[in-house]
Amino acid sequence: MVAVVLIGGIRFLTTRGTTSGDGGDTGTAAGRCTGDAVTLAVTASSEKAQLLKQLAADYMDQGPTVDGRCVQVAVTSKASGGAMAALANGWNEASDGPRPDVWTPASSGWVRLLEQRTQAADRPKMIPPSTPKIAASPLVIAMPRPMAEALGWPKKQLGWADLLDLGRDDTGWARNGHPEWGQFRLGKTNPNYSTSGLNATVGAYFAATKLSSDLTEKDLANPKTRKFVEGVERSVVHYGDTTLTFLSNLQRADDQGAGLSYISAVAVEEKSVWDFNQGNPTGDPATLGKHPKPKVPLVAIYPKEGTLLSDHPWVVLTAPWVDDAKRKAAADLLAYLQADKARAKFQQFAFRDGQAKPGPLVTEANGLLNDQPKALLSPPASSRRSSTTATPPSPSSTTCTGRTSGAPA
Protein backbone atom coordinates (compact mmCIF):
# COMPACT_ATOMS: atom_id res chain seq x y z
CA MET A 1 0.00 0.00 0.00
CA VAL A 2 1.14 3.54 -0.67
CA ALA A 3 1.10 4.51 3.02
CA VAL A 4 3.53 1.69 3.74
CA VAL A 5 5.66 2.68 0.76
CA LEU A 6 5.98 6.13 2.28
CA ILE A 7 6.89 4.75 5.69
CA GLY A 8 9.33 2.25 4.24
CA GLY A 9 10.76 4.80 1.88
CA ILE A 10 11.42 7.46 4.48
CA ARG A 11 13.42 5.24 6.80
CA PHE A 12 16.39 7.43 5.93
CA LEU A 13 14.82 10.15 8.05
CA THR A 14 15.23 8.10 11.21
CA THR A 15 18.89 7.26 10.83
CA ARG A 16 20.17 10.53 12.23
CA GLY A 17 20.66 9.42 15.80
CA THR A 18 17.06 9.28 16.96
CA THR A 19 15.91 6.77 19.52
CA SER A 20 12.70 4.83 19.83
CA GLY A 21 10.64 7.90 20.60
CA ASP A 22 7.55 6.13 21.82
CA GLY A 23 7.02 8.88 24.33
CA GLY A 24 5.02 6.63 26.65
CA ASP A 25 4.22 6.71 30.33
CA THR A 26 2.30 4.37 32.56
CA GLY A 27 0.13 6.88 34.41
CA THR A 28 -3.51 5.91 34.75
CA ALA A 29 -6.79 7.38 35.79
CA ALA A 30 -7.37 6.36 39.40
CA GLY A 31 -9.64 3.38 39.93
CA ARG A 32 -12.80 3.75 42.00
CA CYS A 33 -13.95 0.13 42.15
CA THR A 34 -13.73 -2.62 44.72
CA GLY A 35 -14.39 -6.29 44.23
CA ASP A 36 -14.91 -7.88 40.83
CA ALA A 37 -14.40 -4.88 38.56
CA VAL A 38 -14.16 -4.60 34.79
CA THR A 39 -10.86 -2.85 34.12
CA LEU A 40 -10.57 -1.24 30.70
CA ALA A 41 -7.01 -0.50 29.57
CA VAL A 42 -6.79 2.41 27.12
CA THR A 43 -3.57 3.35 25.32
CA ALA A 44 -3.83 6.92 24.02
CA SER A 45 -1.61 9.11 21.87
CA SER A 46 0.41 11.38 24.09
CA GLU A 47 -1.04 14.76 23.12
CA LYS A 48 -4.46 13.75 24.46
CA ALA A 49 -3.60 11.14 27.10
CA GLN A 50 -3.66 13.49 30.09
CA LEU A 51 -6.96 15.01 29.00
CA LEU A 52 -8.37 11.53 28.43
CA LYS A 53 -7.33 10.57 31.96
CA GLN A 54 -9.37 13.49 33.29
CA LEU A 55 -12.37 12.48 31.21
CA ALA A 56 -12.02 8.86 32.30
CA ALA A 57 -11.99 9.99 35.93
CA ASP A 58 -15.15 12.04 35.34
CA TYR A 59 -16.74 9.02 33.70
CA MET A 60 -15.88 6.77 36.64
CA ASP A 61 -17.34 9.32 39.05
CA GLN A 62 -20.72 8.45 37.53
CA GLY A 63 -20.38 4.87 38.79
CA PRO A 64 -20.63 3.01 35.46
CA THR A 65 -21.35 -0.72 35.52
CA VAL A 66 -21.37 -3.57 33.03
CA ASP A 67 -23.54 -6.60 33.82
CA GLY A 68 -23.61 -5.48 37.45
CA ARG A 69 -19.81 -5.07 37.69
CA CYS A 70 -18.14 -1.75 38.39
CA VAL A 71 -16.08 -0.29 35.53
CA GLN A 72 -12.69 1.28 36.04
CA VAL A 73 -10.53 2.79 33.31
CA ALA A 74 -6.72 2.84 33.13
CA VAL A 75 -5.30 5.28 30.57
CA THR A 76 -1.70 4.95 29.41
CA SER A 77 0.15 7.40 27.19
CA LYS A 78 2.14 6.03 24.25
CA ALA A 79 3.11 7.64 20.96
CA SER A 80 1.01 6.40 18.06
CA GLY A 81 3.84 4.88 16.05
CA GLY A 82 5.33 3.19 19.09
CA ALA A 83 1.97 1.66 20.01
CA MET A 84 1.40 0.52 16.42
CA ALA A 85 4.79 -1.20 16.34
CA ALA A 86 4.20 -2.82 19.75
CA LEU A 87 0.83 -4.21 18.68
CA ALA A 88 2.25 -5.47 15.39
CA ASN A 89 5.04 -7.26 17.26
CA GLY A 90 2.76 -8.92 19.81
CA TRP A 91 2.98 -6.34 22.64
CA ASN A 92 5.55 -7.15 25.30
CA GLU A 93 4.29 -5.66 28.57
CA ALA A 94 7.79 -5.69 30.03
CA SER A 95 9.01 -3.23 27.40
CA ASP A 96 5.83 -1.77 25.91
CA GLY A 97 3.82 -1.07 29.06
CA PRO A 98 0.28 -2.19 29.93
CA ARG A 99 -1.42 -4.08 27.11
CA PRO A 100 -4.39 -2.12 25.73
CA ASP A 101 -7.98 -3.20 25.28
CA VAL A 102 -8.64 0.07 23.45
CA TRP A 103 -6.10 1.92 21.34
CA THR A 104 -6.70 5.53 20.36
CA PRO A 105 -3.83 6.82 18.19
CA ALA A 106 -3.78 10.34 16.84
CA SER A 107 -4.61 9.25 13.30
CA SER A 108 -6.33 6.42 11.45
CA GLY A 109 -3.19 6.20 9.34
CA TRP A 110 -1.60 4.18 12.13
CA VAL A 111 -4.60 1.84 12.14
CA ARG A 112 -4.11 1.13 8.44
CA LEU A 113 -0.41 0.52 9.01
CA LEU A 114 -1.17 -1.94 11.81
CA GLU A 115 -3.57 -3.80 9.52
CA GLN A 116 -0.84 -4.08 6.89
CA ARG A 117 1.80 -5.17 9.41
CA THR A 118 -0.33 -7.91 10.95
CA GLN A 119 -1.38 -9.21 7.55
CA ALA A 120 2.22 -9.26 6.31
CA ALA A 121 3.27 -11.18 9.44
CA ASP A 122 0.31 -13.56 9.12
CA ARG A 123 -0.98 -12.51 12.54
CA PRO A 124 -4.68 -12.42 13.49
CA LYS A 125 -6.56 -9.23 12.66
CA MET A 126 -6.88 -6.79 15.55
CA ILE A 127 -8.94 -3.97 14.03
CA PRO A 128 -12.76 -3.97 14.21
CA PRO A 129 -14.91 -2.93 11.24
CA SER A 130 -15.78 0.39 12.89
CA THR A 131 -13.34 2.85 14.50
CA PRO A 132 -15.38 5.90 15.60
CA LYS A 133 -13.70 9.26 16.14
CA ILE A 134 -13.49 11.12 19.45
CA ALA A 135 -11.70 14.33 18.36
CA ALA A 136 -9.81 15.85 15.44
CA SER A 137 -6.99 18.27 14.68
CA PRO A 138 -5.62 19.17 11.23
CA LEU A 139 -1.92 19.16 10.43
CA VAL A 140 -0.60 22.72 10.16
CA ILE A 141 2.74 24.39 9.62
CA ALA A 142 3.47 26.26 12.84
CA MET A 143 5.49 29.44 12.37
CA PRO A 144 6.45 32.33 14.66
CA ARG A 145 3.84 35.03 14.11
CA PRO A 146 6.23 37.75 12.81
CA MET A 147 7.65 35.34 10.22
CA ALA A 148 4.23 34.22 9.07
CA GLU A 149 3.04 37.82 8.81
CA ALA A 150 6.12 38.64 6.71
CA LEU A 151 4.90 35.97 4.27
CA GLY A 152 1.37 37.41 4.19
CA TRP A 153 -0.43 35.46 6.93
CA PRO A 154 -3.37 35.39 7.58
CA LYS A 155 -4.63 36.83 4.28
CA LYS A 156 -2.33 34.97 1.92
CA GLN A 157 -2.72 31.24 1.33
CA LEU A 158 0.64 29.58 1.96
CA GLY A 159 1.87 26.03 1.59
CA TRP A 160 4.72 23.59 1.13
CA ALA A 161 5.70 25.12 -2.20
CA ASP A 162 6.25 28.50 -0.54
CA LEU A 163 8.46 26.92 2.11
CA LEU A 164 10.45 25.09 -0.57
CA ASP A 165 10.95 28.36 -2.46
CA LEU A 166 12.08 30.15 0.69
CA GLY A 167 14.37 27.32 1.70
CA ARG A 168 16.06 27.31 -1.71
CA ASP A 169 16.84 31.05 -1.58
CA ASP A 170 20.38 31.67 -0.36
CA THR A 171 19.33 35.10 0.90
CA GLY A 172 16.90 33.49 3.33
CA TRP A 173 14.58 35.84 5.15
CA ALA A 174 16.36 38.87 3.64
CA ARG A 175 14.09 38.46 0.62
CA ASN A 176 11.20 39.33 2.94
CA GLY A 177 12.96 42.28 4.55
CA HIS A 178 14.36 40.46 7.59
CA PRO A 179 18.03 39.52 7.10
CA GLU A 180 18.35 39.30 10.90
CA TRP A 181 16.32 36.06 10.81
CA GLY A 182 18.95 34.30 8.69
CA GLN A 183 18.12 31.23 6.62
CA PHE A 184 14.78 29.45 6.60
CA ARG A 185 14.97 26.64 9.19
CA LEU A 186 12.46 23.79 9.14
CA GLY A 187 11.82 21.32 11.95
CA LYS A 188 10.40 17.86 11.46
CA THR A 189 9.41 14.87 13.56
CA ASN A 190 10.03 11.17 13.05
CA PRO A 191 7.34 9.74 10.74
CA ASN A 192 7.81 6.27 12.21
CA TYR A 193 6.49 7.43 15.59
CA SER A 194 5.00 10.91 15.28
CA THR A 195 1.68 11.55 13.57
CA SER A 196 2.67 15.08 12.61
CA GLY A 197 5.89 13.73 11.08
CA LEU A 198 4.00 11.05 9.15
CA ASN A 199 1.36 13.49 7.92
CA ALA A 200 3.95 16.13 7.00
CA THR A 201 5.79 13.62 4.83
CA VAL A 202 2.59 12.45 3.15
CA GLY A 203 1.52 16.09 2.71
CA ALA A 204 4.80 16.97 1.00
CA TYR A 205 4.30 14.13 -1.49
CA PHE A 206 0.77 15.33 -2.22
CA ALA A 207 2.05 18.89 -2.68
CA ALA A 208 4.74 17.66 -5.05
CA THR A 209 2.22 15.81 -7.23
CA LYS A 210 -0.52 18.46 -6.92
CA LEU A 211 -2.95 15.66 -6.08
CA SER A 212 -5.47 15.53 -3.25
CA SER A 213 -6.13 11.78 -3.40
CA ASP A 214 -5.21 8.60 -5.29
CA LEU A 215 -1.47 8.89 -4.68
CA THR A 216 0.19 6.01 -6.54
CA GLU A 217 3.54 4.26 -6.49
CA LYS A 218 4.28 5.81 -9.88
CA ASP A 219 3.74 9.25 -8.36
CA LEU A 220 6.21 8.47 -5.57
CA ALA A 221 8.88 7.34 -8.03
CA ASN A 222 8.52 10.38 -10.30
CA PRO A 223 11.84 12.31 -10.36
CA LYS A 224 10.02 15.65 -10.04
CA THR A 225 8.22 14.39 -6.95
CA ARG A 226 11.47 13.18 -5.44
CA LYS A 227 13.18 16.48 -6.18
CA PHE A 228 10.38 18.47 -4.51
CA VAL A 229 10.39 16.37 -1.34
CA GLU A 230 14.18 16.39 -1.25
CA GLY A 231 14.06 20.18 -1.41
CA VAL A 232 11.74 20.32 1.57
CA GLU A 233 13.99 17.94 3.51
CA ARG A 234 17.06 20.08 2.82
CA SER A 235 15.48 22.87 4.84
CA VAL A 236 15.26 20.60 7.89
CA VAL A 237 17.83 21.68 10.47
CA HIS A 238 16.29 20.08 13.56
CA TYR A 239 15.03 16.54 13.44
CA GLY A 240 13.62 14.74 16.46
CA ASP A 241 11.17 12.07 17.41
CA THR A 242 8.20 14.14 18.52
CA THR A 243 6.45 17.48 18.41
CA LEU A 244 7.25 18.08 22.06
CA THR A 245 10.97 18.00 21.25
CA PHE A 246 10.58 21.07 19.09
CA LEU A 247 7.99 22.95 21.10
CA SER A 248 9.81 22.42 24.41
CA ASN A 249 13.11 23.52 22.86
CA LEU A 250 11.39 26.47 21.22
CA GLN A 251 9.89 27.44 24.59
CA ARG A 252 13.36 27.44 26.14
CA ALA A 253 14.69 29.54 23.25
CA ASP A 254 11.78 31.95 23.63
CA ASP A 255 12.47 32.24 27.37
CA GLN A 256 15.98 33.40 26.43
CA GLY A 257 14.70 35.92 23.87
CA ALA A 258 15.67 33.74 20.91
CA GLY A 259 12.23 32.67 19.72
CA LEU A 260 12.92 33.81 16.15
CA SER A 261 16.30 32.12 15.78
CA TYR A 262 15.63 28.53 16.87
CA ILE A 263 13.32 27.54 14.05
CA SER A 264 11.24 29.07 11.26
CA ALA A 265 8.55 26.41 10.96
CA VAL A 266 7.57 22.95 12.14
CA ALA A 267 4.65 20.71 11.17
CA VAL A 268 2.38 20.00 14.15
CA GLU A 269 -1.26 19.46 14.95
CA GLU A 270 -3.36 22.62 15.14
CA LYS A 271 -4.04 22.10 18.84
CA SER A 272 -0.30 22.02 19.57
CA VAL A 273 -0.05 25.63 18.36
CA TRP A 274 -2.59 26.60 21.00
CA ASP A 275 -0.75 24.56 23.63
CA PHE A 276 2.53 26.35 22.89
CA ASN A 277 0.85 29.75 22.92
CA GLN A 278 -0.46 29.02 26.41
CA GLY A 279 3.08 28.28 27.63
CA ASN A 280 2.13 24.60 27.83
CA PRO A 281 3.85 22.68 25.00
CA THR A 282 3.11 19.31 26.61
CA GLY A 283 -0.64 19.88 26.32
CA ASP A 284 -1.08 18.48 29.84
CA PRO A 285 -4.10 20.15 31.51
CA ALA A 286 -2.31 19.86 34.86
CA THR A 287 0.54 22.15 33.72
CA LEU A 288 -1.62 24.75 31.96
CA GLY A 289 -0.93 28.17 33.45
CA LYS A 290 2.30 27.08 35.16
CA HIS A 291 4.58 28.79 32.63
CA PRO A 292 4.29 32.28 31.07
CA LYS A 293 2.97 32.60 27.55
CA PRO A 294 5.69 32.95 24.89
CA LYS A 295 7.13 36.30 23.90
CA VAL A 296 6.83 35.23 20.26
CA PRO A 297 3.68 33.15 19.70
CA LEU A 298 3.13 30.68 16.89
CA VAL A 299 0.45 30.79 14.22
CA ALA A 300 -0.94 27.99 12.08
CA ILE A 301 -0.42 27.90 8.33
CA TYR A 302 -2.90 25.53 6.69
CA PRO A 303 -1.12 24.26 3.55
CA LYS A 304 -2.84 25.59 0.45
CA GLU A 305 -2.17 22.26 -1.26
CA GLY A 306 -4.44 20.64 1.34
CA THR A 307 -3.68 18.92 4.61
CA LEU A 308 -4.36 15.73 6.52
CA LEU A 309 -6.54 15.34 9.57
CA SER A 310 -5.56 13.65 12.80
CA ASP A 311 -8.91 12.01 13.49
CA HIS A 312 -8.25 10.23 16.82
CA PRO A 313 -10.04 6.91 16.25
CA TRP A 314 -11.39 4.72 19.07
CA VAL A 315 -10.13 1.21 18.32
CA VAL A 316 -11.54 -1.61 20.46
CA LEU A 317 -9.06 -4.35 19.65
CA THR A 318 -10.37 -7.68 18.40
CA ALA A 319 -7.87 -9.54 20.55
CA PRO A 320 -8.32 -12.65 22.74
CA TRP A 321 -7.87 -10.67 25.96
CA VAL A 322 -10.69 -8.24 25.11
CA ASP A 323 -13.79 -10.04 26.36
CA ASP A 324 -17.46 -9.06 26.05
CA ALA A 325 -17.41 -7.14 29.33
CA LYS A 326 -14.48 -5.02 28.17
CA ARG A 327 -16.17 -4.39 24.82
CA LYS A 328 -19.34 -3.22 26.57
CA ALA A 329 -17.30 -0.96 28.84
CA ALA A 330 -15.44 0.46 25.83
CA ALA A 331 -18.73 1.19 24.06
CA ASP A 332 -20.13 2.90 27.15
CA LEU A 333 -17.01 5.05 27.60
CA LEU A 334 -17.08 5.94 23.90
CA ALA A 335 -20.67 7.14 24.25
CA TYR A 336 -19.55 9.35 27.14
CA LEU A 337 -16.61 10.76 25.15
CA GLN A 338 -18.83 11.59 22.17
CA ALA A 339 -21.50 13.32 24.27
CA ASP A 340 -21.74 17.10 24.59
CA LYS A 341 -19.89 17.47 27.90
CA ALA A 342 -16.78 15.58 26.84
CA ARG A 343 -16.84 17.11 23.36
CA ALA A 344 -16.81 20.56 24.94
CA LYS A 345 -13.91 19.49 27.14
CA PHE A 346 -11.87 18.48 24.08
CA GLN A 347 -12.66 21.86 22.52
CA GLN A 348 -11.49 23.63 25.68
CA PHE A 349 -8.02 22.38 24.77
CA ALA A 350 -8.26 23.39 21.10
CA PHE A 351 -9.19 20.02 19.68
CA ARG A 352 -11.94 19.98 17.07
CA ASP A 353 -14.79 17.57 17.59
CA GLY A 354 -15.06 14.18 15.93
CA GLN A 355 -16.56 15.80 12.83
CA ALA A 356 -13.65 18.30 12.71
CA LYS A 357 -15.88 21.22 13.74
CA PRO A 358 -13.75 23.93 15.38
CA GLY A 359 -14.51 25.12 18.89
CA PRO A 360 -14.33 28.61 20.43
CA LEU A 361 -10.53 28.56 20.82
CA VAL A 362 -9.86 28.23 17.09
CA THR A 363 -9.51 31.97 16.46
CA GLU A 364 -7.05 34.28 14.74
CA ALA A 365 -6.21 35.80 18.14
CA ASN A 366 -4.96 32.36 19.16
CA GLY A 367 -3.02 31.96 15.91
CA LEU A 368 -5.63 29.62 14.41
CA LEU A 369 -8.15 30.09 11.58
CA ASN A 370 -11.61 28.61 11.95
CA ASP A 371 -12.36 28.82 8.21
CA GLN A 372 -9.40 26.56 7.46
CA PRO A 373 -8.33 24.13 6.16
CA LYS A 374 -9.88 24.75 2.77
CA ALA A 375 -9.01 21.28 1.50
CA LEU A 376 -8.40 17.93 3.17
CA LEU A 377 -6.22 15.29 1.55
CA SER A 378 -7.35 11.69 1.30
CA PRO A 379 -4.75 9.42 2.94
CA PRO A 380 -3.15 6.74 0.73
CA ALA A 381 -5.41 3.71 0.48
CA SER A 382 -4.47 0.60 2.43
CA SER A 383 -5.45 -1.64 -0.49
CA ARG A 384 -2.41 -0.53 -2.51
CA ARG A 385 0.69 -2.59 -1.80
CA SER A 386 4.23 -2.32 -3.05
CA SER A 387 7.80 -3.04 -2.09
CA THR A 388 8.97 0.24 -3.61
CA THR A 389 11.25 2.17 -1.27
CA ALA A 390 12.66 4.83 -3.56
CA THR A 391 13.19 8.16 -1.81
CA PRO A 392 15.42 11.20 -1.97
CA PRO A 393 18.73 10.96 -0.14
CA SER A 394 19.08 12.15 3.43
CA PRO A 395 20.05 15.82 3.65
CA SER A 396 23.46 16.04 5.25
CA SER A 397 22.76 19.30 7.08
CA THR A 398 20.06 17.85 9.29
CA THR A 399 20.70 17.41 12.98
CA CYS A 400 18.81 15.41 15.56
CA THR A 401 17.35 17.10 18.60
CA GLY A 402 16.96 13.82 20.47
CA ARG A 403 14.20 12.15 22.37
CA THR A 404 11.84 13.80 24.80
CA SER A 405 9.74 11.47 26.91
CA GLY A 406 5.99 11.94 26.95
CA ALA A 407 5.77 13.84 23.70
CA PRO A 408 2.81 14.18 21.44
CA ALA A 409 2.26 11.79 18.62
Protein language model features and the residues they cover:
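Ligand-binding pocket segment of bilobal, Venus flytrap-like solute-binding proteins
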Residues: G203-A300
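Periplasmic-binding protein-like
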Residues: P128-I141, R226-V236, G240, L288-P320
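Extracellular/periplasmic juxtamembrane helices and adjacent flexible linkers that interface
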Residues: M1-G21, V315-A409
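Early extracytoplasmic/lumenal segment of secretory-pathway proteins
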Residues: G9-A120, I127-P128
